[in-house]
């Protein structure tokens, strides 16, 4: 057994404007090459666009999008007797949030358009309304888990 101390899980501080932990996670996920001010600018512009388009609080729209995009189950590769099985496992809360943030950013970036803020805002709005590529990815993940339900007894 290891004798090393287990480090505590560190969480980023809440952001300055919305005082939200989720927004700071989004900012740190958009971050490239350490340019945090640019990442903050993109997120806050996207939230302004959401406010103009939906006439709702952008934080509630964003939280709804995260809830809609969070997967319940996923598949993990498990090697048993020389063959690899895709074993369905439940997703923990933090991982589900992380996956949904990752998918929203990825599919927002893949949208056609100029500004990342506009693309991100549109993806968040679509995800909050249960449409878009992020929701397709979640459903695809659930279908994979459903198809491999027979291997559920190979749990970790």
Curated annotation (Swiss-Prot):
Keywords: Chloroplast, Plastid, Ribonucleoprotein, Ribosomal protein, RNA-binding, rRNA-binding
Signal peptide annotation: none
InterPro entries reported in the protein's UniProt record: Ribosomal_uS7 (IPR000235), Ribosomal_uS7_bac/org-type (IPR005717), Ribosomal_uS7_CS (IPR020606), Ribosomal_uS7_dom (IPR023798), Ribosomal_uS7_dom_sf (IPR036823)
Compartments it resides in: Plastid, Chloroplast
Classification via Gene3D superfamilies: Ribosomal protein S7 domain (1.10.455.10)
Keyword set includes rRNA-binding: yes
Major localization class: plastid
One GO location term (cellular component): chloroplast
Keyword RNA-binding among UniProt keywords: yes
GO molecular function, one term: structural constituent of ribosome
Gene Ontology process terms (BP): translation
Protein task: One of the primary rRNA binding proteins, it binds directly to 16S rRNA where it nucleates assembly of the head domain of the 30S subunit.
Family: Belongs to the universal ribosomal protein uS7 family.
Assembly behavior: Part of the 30S ribosomal subunit.
Entries under HAMAP family matching the protein: Ribosomal_uS7_B
Descriptive protein name: Small ribosomal subunit protein uS7c
Species name: Phaeodactylum tricornutum (strain CCAP 1055/1)
